[in-house]
């Protein structure tokens, strides 16, 4: 039986979280077209008769000197050092740039085995030729490259095979039925944040986080009271929406997802609160990003 830890890295919006969810068969990480939706190192667990793979989904790799981004990049570097294999995900629509060079430099210095995963092959207009030329110039062998569509689940079984081929014999780190090690509070908080980002799309920057005040199981029914924290006054109005329709829609969708995942009915109460410039508070950022 084989087992091991595998980090998933790449630029923002390349489909890292979709890949994690597709392999594990559950919604573990937030999926959004908004770059850098993933903040924490999210663990997903896949177990079959061959063994167990523990995936670590990481924030999108983006070069920036902002405090929040620096904290996210520290998470990426930390995840790489914890794993036996790296999945480097490239969006087939993106022409290789400075981030690709930097990521491959980091991988090379780590001395850790890696696979280049070219994602979204179901899309018509691509930069596949430019990507392959770039990888060839970097000395990446074709055996280390796999082309997939995480969303359409194309070549997902093949990527599992390649991962197992790179892992050593080892024990099961988690019980077979586990597909994540996230605590209920964190999962619930991330579901609410994910729905908020999805509903607002480009209207709201990344200046929000969610905070669970109460999460209780009351006679086999979840009672949840949570806050959506924003950094600016104008953002409160965007989330609440006209006549409270925005926050109502967020609550309804989040409630459905929470009920489905935890297989229990759910009472969810949301409130939007202002914490001015929280995204410039280094201590708070450190607490939010683990």
Swiss-Prot record:
InterPro entries linked: AAA+_ATPase, G_ERA_dom, GTP-bd, GTPase_Era-like, KH_dom-like_a/b, KH_dom_type_2, KH_sf_prok-type, P-loop_NTPase
Chain intervals for the UniProt region annotation (G1): 10-17
GO BP, sorted A to Z: ribosomal small subunit assembly
Cellular component, GO, one term: plasma membrane
A Pfam match: MMR_HSR1
Residue intervals of the Era-type G domain: 2-169
Entry membrane topology: Peripheral membrane protein
PROSITE patterns the UniProt entry points to: G_ERA, KH_TYPE_2
Family the entry assigns: Belongs to the TRAFAC class TrmE-Era-EngA-EngB-Septin-like GTPase superfamily. Era GTPase family.
Assembly mode: Monomer.
NCBIfam families reported in the protein's UniProt record: era, PRK00089.1, small_GTP
Protein name: GTPase Era
Species, as recorded: Borrelia hermsii (strain HS1 / DAH)
Gene: era
């Amino acid at each position: 039986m084989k087992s091991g830890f595998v980090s998933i890295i790449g630029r923002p919006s390349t489909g890292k979280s979709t890949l994690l969810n597709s392999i594990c068969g559950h919604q573990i990480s937030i999926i959004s077209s908004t770059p850098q939706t993933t903040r924490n190192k999210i663990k997903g667990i896949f177990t079959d008769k061959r063994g167990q793979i523990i995936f670590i989904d990481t924030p999108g790799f983006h070069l920036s000197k902002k405090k929040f981004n620096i904290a996210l990049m520290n998470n990426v570097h930390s995840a790489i050092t914890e794993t036996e294999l790296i999945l480097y995900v490239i969006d087939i629509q993106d022409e290789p740039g400075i981030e690709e060079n930097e990521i491959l430099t980091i991988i090379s210095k780590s001395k850790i085995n890696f696979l280049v995963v070219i994602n979204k092959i179901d899309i018509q207009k691509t930069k596949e030729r430019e990507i392959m030329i770039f990888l060839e110039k970097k000395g990446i062998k074709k055996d280390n490259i796999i082309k997939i569509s995480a969303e359409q689940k194309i070549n997902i079984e093949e990527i599992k095979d390649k991962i197992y081929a790179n892992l050593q014999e080892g024990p099961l780190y988690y019980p077979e039925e586990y597909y994540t090690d996230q605590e209920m509070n964190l999962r619930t908080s991330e579901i609410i944040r994910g729905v908020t980002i999805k509903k607002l799309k480009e209207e709201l920057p990344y200046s929000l986080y969610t905070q669970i005040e109460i999460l209780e199981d009351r006679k086999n029914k979840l009672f949840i009271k949570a806050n959506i924290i924003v950094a600016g006054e104008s953002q409160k109005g965007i989330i609440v929406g006209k006549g409270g329709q925005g926050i109502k829609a967020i609550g309804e969708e989040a409630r459905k997802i929470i009920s489905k995942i935890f297989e229990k009915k759910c009472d969810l109460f949301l409130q939007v609160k202002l914490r001015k410039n929280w995204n410039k508070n280094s201590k708070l950022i450190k607490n939010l990003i683990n």
